[in-house]
Amino acid sequence: MGGHSFTFKQFHIDQDRCAMKVGTDSIVLGSWTPVRGAKRILDIGTGTGILALMLAQRTAQQVQIDAVELDKDAVKQAEENINASPWRERIRVIRHDIRTFQAPHYDLIISNPPYFVHGQTLPDAARQLARHTGELDQTALLESAARLLTPFGKLALVLPVEEGEQLVALATAGGWYLQRRCRVETKRGKAPNLVLLLLSRKPAETEEEQLCLRETDNRYSPEFIALADEFYLRMSA
């Protein structure tokens, strides 16, 4: 989903100054993450603001959303995208390193976190900052979330499958519990390449799920349409 902009049913994303563009991974995460009962939400590494905007669309007027981002160009673009949306009064964009960010506790934290490993060559410095695990590794992400969540709060993430397995192992060792795991296949019959994770600090049995995005003929699958139709301008089975 490259290009300089992306239009959804209720909001528009400009992304010409953001290193990481709107992708299916964020759209799936923003559609899948449970928001019931959440009064305060934190988006870690907001980028264009896509996840903050999706959750604003899905939640009641009194829900407050903080969107934290380190890159100054992404912060400016996220602010512009949010200010042009119907939810500008509910979303606050904050330029800060999440590792030292302080705020009242959140009921829900959502993130499409860094997932490139050390040694990978990336096109430019901004993209490297946005996606290099040296900037926010899994340990730092989990520690930040644990510090900022309420006791019953939840952490929702999307990662490539292998990185997701690594994070679950790390989280389990650190006292987290995996509530839900959804393996995502881009096309029917292909091996999953993404995983959606919902973690909490309270004991829970893991719900295992599977999501297919497209059929073999490249049409959106019925389950993906049911999940994301409130956002996409055009989806048809």
Swiss-Prot record:
Stored CDD domains: AdoMet_MTases
E.C. number: 2.1.1.223
Xref: Pfam families: MTS
A GO cellular component annotation in the UniProt record: cytoplasm
Swiss-Prot/TrEMBL catalytic activity: adenosine(37) in tRNA1(Val) + S-adenosyl-L-methionine = N(6)-methyladenosine(37) in tRNA1(Val) + S-adenosyl-L-homocysteine + H(+)
Location(s), subcellular: Cytoplasm
Keyword terms, alphabetized: Cytoplasm, Methyltransferase, S-adenosyl-L-methionine, Transferase, tRNA processing
SUPFAM superfamilies on file: S-adenosyl-L-methionine-dependent methyltransferases
Keyword Magnesium among UniProt keywords: no
Intrachain S-S bonds: none
HAMAP family reported in the protein's UniProt record: tRNA_methyltr_YfiC
Family classification: Belongs to the methyltransferase superfamily. tRNA (adenine-N(6)-)-methyltransferase family.
The protein's name in its UniProt record: tRNA1(Val) (adenine(37)-N6)-methyltransferase
Organism: Tolumonas auensis (strain DSM 9187 / NBRC 110442 / TA 4)
Lineage of origin: Bacteria, Pseudomonadati, Pseudomonadota, Gammaproteobacteria, Aeromonadales
